Amino acid sequence: MRFLKFFMVLAALLAPALPAAAQSRMKAEEVVVAFAAEPRTLLPVTIVDWTTNNMVEHMYDRLVDRDPKTYKPIPMLATSWKVVDNTTWEFSLRSGVKFHNGEPFDAQSVKATMDYIKDPANKTHYASRWSLVKEVQIVDPYTVRFITEKPWPGLIDRISLSDMMMMPPKALRAEGPQGLLAKPVGTGPFKFGQWVRDEKLVVVRNDDYWKGKPELKTVTFRFIPEFSARLAALLAGEIDIMKDVPPHAVDLVDKSGKATVRATVSSRINYLALVTLRPGPMQDIRVRQAIAHAINVDELIQQVLRGRASKMCGPLSPINVDFSPKVQCLKHDVKQAQALLKSANIDPGRLVLTLDTPSGRYPLDKDISQAIAAQLGRIGITVNVVVNEWGTHLDKIKNRTTGDMFFLGWGPALDAQNTIEQLFQGSMTYSSYGGNKPLDDKIATAITIVDPKKRLEAWADIQQMVASEAPWVFLWQQHDLYGVANWIDWQPRADEKVWMYEAKIAKR
């Protein structure tokens, strides 16, 4: 297999500088973007999954966007907003916007979307994320109010994520969710073209987009699970943008004459979850701490990722607005790990654990998981690594059927609530830890604190509390490496939005 991969890349390097297929796409104003997996659905506000939403967002808009440099909230379908009182936010909506089917966007669209999310019958993953919203009230055709159960200063951050993409109310009533799943209808810069399962999703330019039509006529998202296959396709000119170029292949891409690596420090964090939500060794904090001491994060960063990551000590990265620098890293200490296991009456030589990992979703995820297994093997622990297809991996986490540990990334949350609330409370979809009432109470209080200074202090206290519980092995803030064809003018963003509305043809 290694020889096959070598010859695939070699053949790509020997191909013409701009293959015929790439030349044809350039003339047709089409870009092909490769992701590791296909979308899990095309129905918005359904599944919390970056890969899915990165594609779906090309067809659907939100009320609020983020500035691509500062990541502060900026207008999208809402032109402005204000706090009326502690439990009321008012949004003024953009007029003259139409869905792809001609249906007008207005206050009814906002209310219908929120009602759909909160309806238990629809079983959306986002329902819990909007639990503080009591209702959306229509003030007039282009003004809405979000009424919350308690003060919620973080609402504007939540609304700028993928949590509430606007759906057309008439089409939703007439065709139902299955109709919009088969043929998405949003207000976004691209319209649905076709979805060929296990192969590609095609979106085409919306010439009537309210912000101005995109330069690209067509964007094709191809689904290529393996890093090596994505790399070979990039160098052969079969694709134009790939995420997660393996660190060892950076020079190969840069010297190819066909593409370059464009890097950014991501808001995404990577971690090893230690599952405490069912009976097992991870329910003992001494075992969790022992595993954290036994894993050498610095070694993983240097030897596997070649330095392309920033070590973390707690649940938030420095890019997060609520990050606390006071949280200290748990040091790599084999003797301490052994002592903790001994105090827990566990013989490491008889301890067998299972680690679930995706392959191709995050930078060298499978390799990292195997390296972690090897490190734990140094103190006698046997770790069986289970490699999952991406959708299967998420389903196992959601259904609580993973092994004792799982590898996952989280982002692009830029505030504490969107990470800590979602991942350290047992009722949440992707959590691995829960049942800590003092922590739950602190989280519930922090979310409602209006004073910015007091809120920051509350989240700092929570970060320290989380770190002391060792619910994860805190790994790193991800560095994103994109391979981009030389004829495309596009720059990556820290929030991982592969936004083709911003892409242009650099040379003709």
What are these regions (language model features)?
Residues 196, 270, 294-323, 363-373, ...:
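Detector for C-terminal structural segments
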Residues 79-123, 139, 145, 230-233, ...:
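Aromatic- and charge-enriched surface segment that lines or borders ligand/interaction sites
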